[in-house]
Amino acid sequence: MIFAAGLGTRLKPLTDTMPKALVPVGGEPLLHHVIMKLKDAGFERIVVNVHHFAQQIIDYLDANRNFGLDIRISDEREGLLETGGGIKKALPFFDQASPILIHNVDILSNLDLAQVMKTSETTPDALLLVSQRKTKRYLLFADDMHLKGWTNIETGQVRSPYSSLREDSSLHDSSTLFTPFPSEARQPVAFHPSLQKLAFSGIHVIWPSVFPLFSEMPDRFGIIDFYLKYCHQFAFVGHEQHDLQLMDVGKLDTLHDAEQFLNNLQ
């Protein structure tokens, strides 16, 4: 599934007249780059969610005969459903016995997506591609790379289904969801050295074992909320590819760099 419904506010004024998915990089729209990457990896069915200038995306796919693939449109023109709600709405399009790879439309990388799917076979519930890039928001993982929480290092906010991340025992005892750290605990990793603080890449694989959980969620929610709600019950595993080259093309000042990035990947 390709997330292409976003408003692309960080790419204004380009997105005043087109969807983010059709912003060109290296002579082709972002959507083209992601579709071809999926096609090269052997994917045959792709769901693309649409909202902002949705018809432009539909027309682009029609003009290219869906690139020879089975491409389905998950229409969110009535209202953006966010990343989690977008998956929930699109689930009927998928084989309920097979995993789904989710890919943000504005992510370029050197990832071998076929290998990502193979790696995900060792994780029963979900595989999250992560990296050590600098950001304000991080996912928190234990030594075995199982997801334990989320933090905003700028505000000090921590979200986790565990009562505390400061003691070893807390990593095994579930409690009230999203119990925050005390306000003075600004750096949660410092309180629990075994936790790793890693940035989410916008690429992840979800297995059928957790598909039923989406029915318990509202129609509109973020996928990180989903992962945090259930990470104490299911195996949501982070995967860090050490030779990863990845770029988020989400801002105007990254477009020029993105073209050079693509050239370097070739």
Descriptions of predicted regions:
Residues 11, 57-61, 214, 258:
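Hydrophobic packing residues within well-ordered alpha-helices of enzyme cores
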Residues 7, 105-107:
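Active-site metal-binding loops of divalent metal-dependent hydrolases
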Residues 127-144:
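Short beta-strand-to-loop element that shapes/binds the nucleotide-sugar donor at the catalytic cleft/hinge
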Residues 101, 108, 114-121, 133-134, ...:
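Catalytic-core segments of class I nucleotidyltransferases/pyrophosphorylases
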Residues 21, 70-72, 235-237:
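Conserved beta-strand segments of alpha/beta enzyme cores
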Residues 1-16, 37-41:
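N-terminal nucleotide-binding beta1-loop-alpha1 segment
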Residues 2, 24, 28-104, 115, ...:
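Conserved N-terminal catalytic core of the sugar/cofactor nucleotidyltransferase
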